[in-house]
Design a protein with these regions (language model features):
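Beta-strand-rich binding/interaction modules
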Residues: 84-87, 95-159
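Hydrophobic alpha-helical and helix-loop surface patches within well-folded domains
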Residues: 1-104, 115
C-alpha cells in the first residue's frame, strides 16, 4: 500500500484530473502519471482488448494532434463500446486510494463459496465525502486438481 500511490495517502493527495492548479509544473505528479496509467489499464480490463482497441482507434480518429482531456478519452471508450463509464469517472475526480476489506467463506454442504468485498476511501485534503469506485477484477475457482470450476454469481439466481 505505501509503495503504490503513496502520494494519495499524504497531504499532497489530489485527483488524477485536478479541478485547478497553481502552475502547470504542479501538474506533473506521480498521481497524474502512475495512477492515471493504472486507471487506463482498468478501463482496458473492464472493456476487454477488442473494445479497448476500438475505443483507442476512435479516440485517435477524433483527436489526433489535438489538446485533449480525460473526458475525451473516456467518451471515446463509451462511444466505441456502448458502455456507460460515468461511475468509472470517479477515478479521475476523487483523490485517495480505495481500501478493500475481503472476507471469504465456503459452505461445503451447499457447495457455495462466498466472497464479500467492502470498499472505503480515506478522507484526503478537500475531499471527505467519497463515493465507491468501480474496480474491475477477474476471479475464478479451481478444483482440487487445479481444473477451472464453473462460476455462477448469486445475482444470476435473481433472474
Amino acid at each position: 500500500r505505501t509503495a503504490q500511490f503513496a502520494e494519495d495517502a499524504g497531504p499532497m493527495a489530489h485527483p488524477v484530473r485536478p479541478e485547478s492548479y497553481m502552475e502547470i509544473t504542479n501538474f506533473y505528479t506521480l498521481t497524474i502519471y502512475e495512477k492515471g496509467s493504472e486507471v487506463v489499464g482498468m478501463i482496458h480490463t473492464l472493456l476487454g482488448p477488442d473494445l479497448f482497441r476500438k475505443g483507442s482507434d476512435l479516440y485517435f480518429e477524433r483527436h489526433d494532434g489535438q489538446a485533449v482531456t480525460t473526458d475525451d478519452f473516456v467518451r471515446a471508450m463509451e462511444d466505441a463500446s456502448g458502455r456507460d463509464l460515468s461511475q468509472f469517472r470517479l477515478w479521475y475526480e476523487q483523490s485517495g486510494t480505495p481500501e478493500l476489506t475481503v472476507r471469504d467463506e465456503f459452505d461445503d454442504a451447499a457447495g457455495i463459496y462466498r466472497l464479500t468485498i467492502k470498499q472505503s476511501i480515506p478522507d484526503t485534503p478537500g475531499q471527505t465525502d467519497k463515493k465507491p469506485q468501480h474496480i474491475p477484477f477477474a476471479i475464478g475457482l479451481l478444483g482440487a486438481e487445479g481444473e477451472s470450476l464453473p462460476l455462477k454469481l448469486a445475482a444470476d439466481d435473481a433472474d
